[in-house]
């Protein structure tokens, strides 16, 4: 009986041990399944709960690279770029200042030619014409005088210079040289040409005289009409042999109208028109010359 009881106890202990092992295995499997499920859930939802704070930060933000200390070459290149930008800015600023009109520079320019009486006279005018590359008797000098509203031929006063050059925005020789074509363009406009033509009479005459000396008149007419009026050589010849010593303003202005309106063969000239006697005599002289 005692041996039977011992056998039963042995079998019972074996079963209990087996059950305990099975229980441990069951709990182990449960833990394994739970961990796997949690890992899958975290992967799907992007959870960072299983990460430490530093690991999580590194996953979200890439690690910062350490800044490399600037080498001598880098500093030199940076300085070179800065200097280049400054030189470019400075040259642009200087160029802008040079292009802008300066009354001070214009005044200094005037005194390169003016005498102690604040007037550019014949000697200064000769040097001035040489500097801008224009002969004194060139018609563009007459246009310039007109723009300056100069009152006496061969002279520019300080006031005339400053007022005229300011309107032209010229304060250096180079700027005026670059403006010469613009001045010549006034001669191509009939209205401006007429203004210049009329101005020339008062500009060239002696201020104590109401008329223009015949020799001065022939020179000025040649300057203004010599290249554009085909009959000018004949008219000049007429003046050479005529008795006229002066030309008044009415005669002067009518010569321009005659050159613009009368045909080269004079066929449309009206002897009964309001032309001055000077032109009546020219027409008669020219017709006689043609017939002889």
UniProtKB/Swiss-Prot annotation:
It comes from Homo sapiens. GO terms for cellular component: nucleus; ubiquitin ligase complex. GO terms for molecular function: cullin family protein binding; ubiquitin conjugating enzyme binding; ubiquitin-like protein binding. Keywords: Isopeptide bond, Nucleus, Ubl conjugation. It comes from the Eukaryota. Contributes to the neddylation of all cullins by transferring NEDD8 from N-terminally acetylated NEDD8-conjugating E2s enzyme to different cullin C-terminal domain-RBX complexes which are necessary for the activation of cullin-RING E3 ubiquitin ligases (CRLs). Residues 101-287 form the DCUN1 domain. GO terms for biological process: positive regulation of protein neddylation; protein neddylation. Residues 43-83 are annotated as: Disordered. It is found in: Nucleus. There is a cross-link at residue 95 (Glycyl lysine isopeptide (Lys-Gly) (interchain with G-Cter in SUMO2)). This is DCN1-like protein 4. Interacts (via the DCUN1 domain) with the unneddylated cullins: interacts with CUL1, CUL2, CUL3, CUL4A, CUL4B and CUL5; these interactions promote the cullin neddylation and the identity of the cullin dictates the affinity of the interaction. Interacts with RBX1 and RNF7. Interacts with CAND1; this interaction is bridged by cullins such as CUL3 and strongly inhibits the neddylation of CUL3. These CAND-cullin-DCNL complexes can only be neddylated in the presence of a substrate adapter. The DCUN1 domain, also known as PONY domain, mediates the interaction with different cullins. The DCUN1 domain mediates the interaction with the N-terminally acetylated NEDD8-conjugating E2s enzyme leading to the NEDD8 transfer from N-terminally acetylated NEDD8-conjugating E2s enzyme to different cullin C-terminal domain-RBX complexes; the neddylation efficiency correlates with the DCUN1D5-cullin and DCUN1D5-E2 interaction affinities. Residues 45-56 have a biased composition (Polar residues).
């Amino acid at each position: 009986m005692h041996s039977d009881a011992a056998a039963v106890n042995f079998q019972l202990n074996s079963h209990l041990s087996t059950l305990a092992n099975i229980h441990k295995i069951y709990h182990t499997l449960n833990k394994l399944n739970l961990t796997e499920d949690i890992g899958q859930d975290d992967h799907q939802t992007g959870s960072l709960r299983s990460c430490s704070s530093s690991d999580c930060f590194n996953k979200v933000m890439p690690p910062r690279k350490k800044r490399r200390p600037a080498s001598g070459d880098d500093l030199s290149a940076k300085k070179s770029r800065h200097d280049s930008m400054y030189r470019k800015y400075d040259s642009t600023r200087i160029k802008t200042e040079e292009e802008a009109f300066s009354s001070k520079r214009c005044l200094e320019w005037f005194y390169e030619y003016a005498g102690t009486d604040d007037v550019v006279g014949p000697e200064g005018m000769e040097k001035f014409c040489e500097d801008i590359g224009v002969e004194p008797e060139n018609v563009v000098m007459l246009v310039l005088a007109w723009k300056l509203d100069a009152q006496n031929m061969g002279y520019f006063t300080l006031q005339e210079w400053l007022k005229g050059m300011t309107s032209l925005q010229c304060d250096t020789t180079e700027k005026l040289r670059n403006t010469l074509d613009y001045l010549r363009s006034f001669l191509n406009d009939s209205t401006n040409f007429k203004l210049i033509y009329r101005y020339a009479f008062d500009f060239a005459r002696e201020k104590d005289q109401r008329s223009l000396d015949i020799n001065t008149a022939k020179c000025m007419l040649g300057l203004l009409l010599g290249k554009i009026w085909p009959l000018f050589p004949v008219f000049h010849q007429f003046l050479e042999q005529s008795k006229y010593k002066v030309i008044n303003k009415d005669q002067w202005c009518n010569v321009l109208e005659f050159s613009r309106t009368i045909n080269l063969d004079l066929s449309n000239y009206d002897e009964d028109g309001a032309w001055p006697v000077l032109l009546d005599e020219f027409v008669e002289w020219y017709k006689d010359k043609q017939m002889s």
